């Protein structure tokens, strides 16, 4: 069954070369296959799944807005954003930009928009990791640009399963593209996962990530059960394919 699942997901070549991976059956709560599932390493933008959970659980203002400022710039990797700076943007639109397009500036802006400082937000991320039993996980920023954001495939299974409780995360995970409303403009962005972008597969949870120190990362939970099972695939690979 596993080979059938992976072939449907178009991920057999990726798993074959992955440094660490786990295929987990949420329906029956068991590991189907894995390699070095407890290996700890940077997780890049997969971090944003925790950012989304912490923001949704702590933000008390349904109409909150935030502006991207100099404090949100990427001084680590030098990435850019399509969103306008110094312009009030709905937090819901920032969340969309972060989960669909993996916008780092949006992740930074959200981390100071839930009624706490950025440092307090990061502390909440680490507290949530401990609460979920993610013993190998540490966060130092909300975007994943820092290589100090570390975890393991086994820990990320717990985060993926927990994220299934958030309707907004599930809805945004499966958007091939989106328009972000920002300062009177509609900014078009595409999903960072080709499987979702080209509508090859429906995702319940989907987050990609890449920095040089981590390689290519993916957390993917299929939306429609395969052989009556909900499959969670997490991998880290030196190449995107």
PLM region spans:
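Sec-dependent N-terminal signal peptides
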Residues: 4-13
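Penicillin-recognizing serine hydrolase domain
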Residues: 19-20, 116-237, 241
